[in-house]
């Protein structure tokens, strides 16, 4: 029971067991997707993703977003098994008031959760923003011999995520910008609450994302750890954002409810939980975690600690060679504004003719932009009317020179708002977006999550 393959198998079975048990104990939740995605989740957290459980706020960590937030027990199980500050008792308290394991992941509640998800599609937009933040920070602070920012954003999305309009808006601009460090896994289980996706969903999704400018890949068996890792490696090697279709049977390996909507949004039932554990050759004990998995968690922690220590060495060398830039970096990451940021702001005398507030806003924005290097944003195709362009600064474009700061969002208000949330959550930047007030209705779901 000590080989890596066996540890992987134990971890996958543990994730499935915890997901069933937690939802059953809470008498509420979504067991089927965490069960089906256990191999993918474990591959990400144990092998592919660069992260350090002891330092969940490490600036150069890979970000992970569970866009299908209803599958939260997948993320909680992975955080626990990887050594984050989330105990087995926390998992036992799934969906209980005041617990660290709410029904959907919440950024400000649970260590290791990068963004609040639940409303489908938002996580894809958040991921676009995080990938944009990485590009901005790399252009602003990386120097020859000192690569401080070089990380990826991994997203797991469901059929429902892919149907939502915000996902298409976000995928469109991500492809246009060639955000090659954004990788989205699509859990193609062909099931929604109302039944098979045949009822509602018939387009060629891979062709759609290919048209958006993404690399598209496919893994036909979501249980195949080798195929999952190979697809991820191919994604990491491409300059385009990558969209990986993963076929999974929801609820696997439950003997009576797999591949049905019955495994989606309700407890399996105690009899089905026991039957599933028997199929897995797993103890029927609730919340069982084998002792052997301590070795797997230690491996994740050790690898993370090594990578974090290496980054700290690079940061120390950067401080010695570029002290002024390092001070700017510290301020950016802590959210501090530079000294004198509010000096010399324009003032506006009373004028009987009146001054449009958008013109005053534009003048102040440009005064701030000259002093706050992390100010990043733009308008949804209304820059001239909103006066939201920062003059003389580089735009976010695939081959732009300089530090990208102006964003031409296009007519994508919803994606703009979701990406702004991702930019803000990533840290190191101060994002903004602009449109007409009446069009802000298109942004409302993301504004609520902000």
Region annotations inferred by a language model:
Residues 26-38, 64-70, 95, 105-126, ...:
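Active-site nucleophile and cofactor-binding loops and adjacent substrate-binding regions
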Residues 71-73, 162-164, 190-194, 225-227, ...:
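Flexible loop/turn segments at secondary-structure boundaries
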Residues 19, 30, 40, 75, ...:
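Buried hydrophobic positions in well-ordered alpha/beta secondary-structure cores of metabolic enzymes
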Residues 14-28, 187-189:
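N-terminal capping segment at the start of a domain
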Residues 313-449:
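Non-catalytic terminal/interface segments that mediate subunit docking, oligomerization
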Residues 36-177, 389-390, 419, 423:
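Cofactor-binding active-site loop characterized by glycine-rich and histidine/acidic residues
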Residues 53-54, 109-110, 115-299:
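Glycine-rich ThDP/TPP pyrophosphate-binding loop and its adjacent helix/strand module
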Residues 85-112, 195, 206, 212-215, ...:
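Anionic-ligand anchoring segments at beta-strand to alpha-helix junctions in alpha/beta enzyme folds, i.e.
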């Amino acid at each position: 029971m000590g080989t890596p393959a066996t540890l992987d198998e134990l971890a996958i079975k543990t994730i499935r067991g915890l997901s069933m048990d937690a939802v059953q104990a809470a008498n509420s939740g979504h067991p089927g997707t965490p069960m089906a995605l256990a191999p993918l989740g474990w591959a990400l957290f144990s092998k592919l993703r660069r992260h350090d459980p002891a330092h969940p706020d490490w600036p150069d960590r890979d970000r992970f977003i569970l866009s299908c937030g209803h599958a939260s027990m997948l993320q909680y199980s992975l955080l626990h098994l990887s050594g984050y500050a989330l105990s087995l008792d926390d998992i036992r308290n799934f969906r209980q008031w005041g617990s660290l394991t709410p029904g959907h992941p919440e950024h400000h509640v649970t260590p290791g959760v990068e963004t609040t998800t639940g409303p489908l599609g938002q996580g894809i937009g958040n991921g676009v923003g995080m990938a944009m933040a990485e590009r901005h920070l790399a252009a602003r602070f990386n120097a020859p011999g000192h690569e401080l920012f070089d990380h990826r954003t991994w997203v797991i999305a469901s059929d429902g995520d892919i149907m939502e309009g915000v996902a298409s808006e976000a995928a469109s601009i991500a492809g246009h910008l060639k955000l090659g460090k954004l990788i989205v896994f699509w859990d193609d289980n062909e099931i929604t609450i109302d039944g098979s996706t045949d009822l509602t969903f018939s387009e060629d999704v891979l062709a759609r994302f290919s048209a958006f400018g993404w690399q598209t890949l496919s893994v036909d068996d979501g249980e195949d750890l080798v195929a999952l890792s190979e697809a991820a490696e191919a994604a990491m090697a491409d300059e385009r954002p990558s969209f990986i279709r993963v076929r999974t049977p929801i609820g696997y390996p439950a003997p009576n409810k797999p591949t049905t909507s019955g495994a989606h949004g309700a407890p399996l039932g105690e009899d089905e939980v026991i039957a599933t554990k028997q199929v897995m050759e797993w103890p029927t004990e609730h919340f069982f975690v084998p002792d052997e998995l301590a070795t797997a968690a230690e491996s994740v922690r050790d690898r993370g600690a090594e990578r974090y220590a290496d980054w700290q060495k690079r940061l120390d060398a950067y401080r010695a060679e570029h002290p002024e830039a390092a001070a700017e970096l510290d301020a950016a990451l802590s959210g501090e504004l530079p000294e004198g940021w509010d000096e010399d702001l324009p003032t506006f005398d009373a004028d009987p003719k009146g001054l449009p507030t958008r013109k005053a806003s534009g003048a102040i924005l440009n005064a701030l932009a000259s002093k706050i290097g992390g100010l990043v944003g733009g308008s949804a195709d209304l820059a001239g009317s909103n006066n939201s362009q920062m003059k003389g600064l580089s735009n976010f474009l695939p081959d732009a020179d300089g530090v990208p700061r102006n964003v031409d969002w296009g007519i994508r208000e919803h994606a703009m708002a979701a990406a702004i949330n991702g930019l803000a959550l990533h840290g190191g930047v101060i994002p903004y977006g602009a449109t007409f007030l009446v069009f802000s209705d298109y942004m409302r779901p993301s504004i609520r999550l902000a």
